[in-house]
Amino acid sequence: MAQSNAFNVVEATIDDIHAAYKSGQLTCRQLVQMYLDRIEAFDKKGPAINAIITIDSDALKEADRLDAAYKASGPVGPLHGIPVIVKDQADVKGMPTTLGSVLFNDYYPDRDSFVAENLRKAGAVILAKATLGELGGGDTHGSLFGSTRNPYDLARTVGGSSGGSAASVSANFSTVGVGQEGLASIRRPSTWNGITGMRPSAGLVSRGGVYGCWPEIFGSLGPMARTVKDLATLLDVMVGYDPEDPITARGVGHIPDTFTNFLNKDGLKGARLGILRESIGLNAEPDSEDFRKISEVFDRAVGELKAAGAEIVDPIVIPKIKELLAKRSGGPGETEQSFKNYYGRSAKSPFKSPQEVIDSPDFAKVVKRSQDRFKRNPDAAKHYESLRAQDELMTIFLKVMADHKLDAIVHKAVEHQPTLIKDGVNPPFVDQKGAPHLNTFLVYVPTIVVPAGFTRDNLPAGVCLIGRPYDDGNLIKFAYAYEQATNHRRPPASTTGL
């Protein structure tokens, strides 16, 4: 079937696509083919963004099935015919879960992750799996694929670890994407690729079928999109109770009928926002010119928040924040338990234990920092200290919000511009430079980033909002109001056309 020349897929929203389906202007097959053409032109060729690891060979067949269903009885669900790209850390049956590593190139899970299953039920087309920091952490480099390039500057990294998802959404390889965050793995690449991304409150989204999120309440899948409305629509589908992930029991009672009910362009009017100016980014250099370029954008953003009706408390101070963040550590047996919890879902585990992974001849090909993280020796004393610091920081954070009567806290989404790829691969490198890791401790609070414009170097920057536990809806409201007031999103020039 010929493609629809009248429909422009670049920056198309879920509403745009559904309106085109309804009018007969577009079919799901045509849309999927448009995205496949863009992936071929801009990910594999041209600028060679290198954000995609695996494309679903049955994507067009699934599109045909959805077109037939639509013709027979209307949309299958809220994401009918919407192409989604998923970070290659979450299982999607029919595609390998590689973790970006040669070690797992041939691992095909025998079932969907909880979120992938929800996406299918909602009518989405899971188009592809995206690149990531190898083994699920760090900047987006891996032994299986190399490095992913930032579509705004091909010499720079996309960030990580959900860099492939972020670049794919920004470059219009799909309508929306799914990332995973433990430290800043959704927010940092979303910021550096000029899109919006959210790490929901722990317990809203299941960790079932996602590598590296267990046993600690550490990681969560989250939505990534070019607009806050699309993000909210995707989040509606991702959330829910999963009997296989006990932590989702905590989310019961905190899930609204739809997060889109919170979308209000006047949502910032009367909202009290505290501005956190203290540097909390990893390896940040507050006296550098690069840091100042981000600060300029952030200062403008604070003014824009105020102009949109927010009451600004500037600055606010979170006592002991750096001291407590410095005590963050991995848990004892974290790799061992993560391995068991994840591969225990499948009858096709490629390795029996982490030690077997380490003993594999291919382990030497893994990015060095990913090797180090995987081999990390447990330290029970440091882990205990970390848990105490986590609890103390959570109490301090909530007290600051209560003392100032705040609805949210705002800080720089990332404190530096995207780093050069060469700096992230070969020593001396700066991994995750400027990434704020406050929410690594505050796992039950939601956090969202929104584009805030561009630096003097024409690179994307963003603002990050953090709210109270399970106040995800209001955080979406504030983000949407800021987005509508500013419209900072701009697609990258390197992937224009088609």
Which residues does each PLM region occupy?
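Gly/Ser-rich, acidic/histidine-flanked active-site/gating loops
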Residues: 2, 10, 90, 96, ...
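Glycine-rich, small-residue loops and helix-cap segments
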Residues: 24, 81, 121, 127, ...
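Short glycine/serine-rich loop segments
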Residues: 107-241, 442-464
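A short helix-breaking turn/cap at a secondary-structure junction
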Residues: 199-296, 486-498
